[in-house]
Amino acid sequence: MADAAEGEQPKLSKKELNKLARKAKKDEKAGEKGGNQQQAAAMDQEDASKDFYGSYGLVNSKEKKVLNFLKVKEINVSNATKDVWVRGRIHTTRSKGKNCFLVLRQGVYTVQVAMFMNEKISKQMLKFVSSISKESIVDVYATINKVDNPIESCTQKDVELLAQQVFVVSTSAPKLPLQIEDASRRAPTDEEKASEQENQLAVVNLDTRLDNRVIDLRTPTSHAIFRIQAGICNQFRNILDVRGFVEIMAPKIISAPSEGGANVFEVSYFKGSAYLAQSPQLYKQMAIAGDFEKVYTIGPVFRAEDSNTHRHMTEFVGLDLEMAFNFHYHEVMETIAEVLTQMFKGLQQNYQDEIAAVGNQYPAEPFQFCEPPLILKYPDAITLLRENGIEIGDEDDLSTPVEKFLGKLVKEKYSTDFYVLDKFPLSVRPFYTMPDAHDERYSNSYDMFMRGEEILSGAQRIHDADMLVERAKHHQVDLAKIQSYIDSFKYGCPPHAGGGIGLERVTMLFLGLHNIRLASLFPRDPKRLTP
């Protein structure tokens, strides 16, 4: 074969050509990668803020890091010019050009965070911060700056934070099931609804709130409601402790319905059945028989009532108390009324900001009460109702509408939202209620009302074993299931009385809320078992 002419390129096989093509493509990619790395390095070099923003990633306790955080509520003009760390949720974000503004929320408190592009705040940092989804939790290192004009959209109106560093602690999904601003908005009045104004802002309905309760609980109003509710429990405990009461813990799984009725949840209990307690009633009394003299308990109670109303739930928190007395059950009734009025005063003195916050979204007349509390006898209440057009029998129980109407009449006549109704008909009270000594139609029992709705039911209890058996039989209570309760009165028991208060109902009525579910963290009713 003749040699190739001088200067001519040797012919390559198809295999060799493909190999060269692959090498060229590989070299091209390597060049692109190198160029990209150089470009990224250049961008990093340009980003003067690269170490001052980003995400912590998953905080799984891999290191102990100490940062001294300042609470949002503590940010004020007295701290102006100080550099501080603050942790909170991103409530709102707005950015334009070289500026970015956040509202940082921590509980019920909010503060504005401002960022301006400069030699320390890069364009990349502004872009990153403005892209953080609402409700994400962030750490901000910033200088507290006094502002010339009040920031009306925040609780901290006289200051803002000039951010230097921003790090994401926990990211929220970008699409929220409801907006905090919408959930915080006051519901329109009837007049506003009737006007059919265009461009009305969205208002979140109750079911949507409860379906997405975790988000709804973040609103300032929800925080205020449950701070007040915690205050009710705290004051109830403190007032009774000072008066010599002992807190007890009563069982919630019991052998027989505690109220002697049918509205109970029956549960399997090994080879038999048990019930969820409708109240701690029997065990409060047994504690009195055990010479505790004055007791109280706070805990859940259960009612299997198929009532889908604004004031009923199947599970709620009971504030219950029981007390031995010397000669007359009014010793106890008046004590309970005094405890409640003392509690109302404490709430109005110590929770003014929270009461105002709730009132902004759910306007209501301030709660009124008098001292000493008004005590109205049942026959007198019946007379008052009849004088105002209500047809009702002497021994009839009060329906919910009649209770409301009576509350309205009492408010007009006595200028109080709180009163005691004494001497209920015996036929409408539980089996353990002591009959009236002078008129067998009535009983030594009482209810207490707020804004025309019952918040406490109480009475003198039967402390004689034989009489208790007689009344239990009358109410068709299975004696075998309450034998230990009956036996506790065979060995001598002081006369005693007490009552049970519904925590959520007191919260609702004190604040003038329209539905008890707003005063329950995760409410339970016949139609709701989740979340």
From Swiss-Prot:
Q: What is its EC number?
A: 6.1.1.12
| PROSITE patterns according to UniProt | AA_TRNA_LIGASE_II
Fill in the subunit field for this protein: Homodimer.
Q: Where is the composition biased (Basic and acidic residues)?
A: 8-32
The record's annotation in NCBIfam families points to: aspS_nondisc, PRK05159.1
Q: Which GO terms describe its biological process?
A: aspartyl-tRNA aminoacylation
User: Which superkingdom?
Assistant: Eukaryota
A Pfam family assignment:
tRNA-synt_2
InterPro entries named among the record's database cross-references: Aa-tRNA-synt_II, aa-tRNA-synth_II, aa-tRNA-synth_II/BPL/LPL, Asp-tRNA_synthase_2, Asp/Asn-tRNA-synth_IIb, NA-bd_OB-fold, NA-bd_OB_tRNA
HAMAP family to which the protein is assigned, alphabetical = Asp_tRNA_synth_type2
Which CDD domains does this UniProt record tie to the protein?
AspRS_cyto_N, AsxRS_core
| Binding positions (L-aspartate) | E259, R303, S457, R461
Q: What is its main location?
A: cytoplasm
Catalytic activity annotated for this protein?
tRNA(Asp) + L-aspartate + ATP = L-aspartyl-tRNA(Asp) + AMP + diphosphate
Recite the UniProt keywords alphabetically. Aminoacyl-tRNA synthetase, ATP-binding, Cytoplasm, Ligase, Nucleotide-binding, Protein biosynthesis
Q: What is stated as this protein's family in its record? A: Belongs to the class-II aminoacyl-tRNA synthetase family. Type 2 subfamily.
Q: Which GO terms describe its cellular component?
A: aminoacyl-tRNA synthetase multienzyme complex; cytosol
The name on file for this protein is Aspartate--tRNA ligase, cytoplasmic
Binding site residues for ATP:
R303, A304, E305, R311, H312, M313, E454, G502, L503, E504, R505
Region of interest (Disordered), residue spans: 1-45
